[in-house]
């Protein structure tokens, strides 16, 4: 089958969950000309979250990848030009109130507000698990449909 797609920023969004949520924000921050919206659900958005196992070799690689690309630090250190570009993307994040990394999401929200970059942040009942993420997907799809209709 063939599907019609829009090959422009207005027809493109990026989303992810957990580390993928952080990754979606990293990519959208570095390529704001490509996406009209970026979504993160339960995203690991800063390196200050350090699980107990981070000192083992099997886990240290992903931890340092977050430290090197922190979406929170990106906003904190962005130039005026980068801030203007970030304002062209619709940002949305959600996280469960019992998720151990919720504070990285709060930090991102605070930094975005400090720079007056519009962002939607939702905290719902839930943990860092598939039960929470299954509820997030319909919300993300509804928001993107709205974005496509009004772009």
Language model features: what each stretch is:
Residues 1-151:
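Non-catalytic cap/lid and distal C-terminal segments of serine-dependent acyl enzymes
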């Amino acid at each position: 089958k063939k599907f019609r797609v829009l090959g422009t920023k207005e027809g493109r969004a990026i989303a992810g969950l957990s580390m993928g949520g952080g990754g979606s924000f990293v990519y959208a921050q570095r390529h704001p000309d490509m996406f009209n919206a970026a979504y993160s659900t339960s995203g690991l958005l800063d390196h200050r979250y350090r699980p107990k196992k981070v000192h083992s070799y099997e886990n240290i690689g992903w931890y340092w990848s977050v430290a090197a690309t922190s979406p929170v630090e990106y906003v904190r250190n962005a130039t005026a030009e980068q801030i203007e570009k970030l304002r062209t993307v619709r940002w949305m994040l959600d996280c469960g109130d019992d998720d151990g990394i919720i504070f990285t999401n709060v930090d991102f929200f605070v930094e975005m507000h400090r720079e007056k970059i519009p962002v939607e942040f939702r905290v719902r009942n839930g943990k860092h698990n598939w039960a929470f993420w299954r509820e997030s997907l319909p919300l993300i799809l509804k928001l993107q449909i709205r974005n496509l209709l009004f772009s």
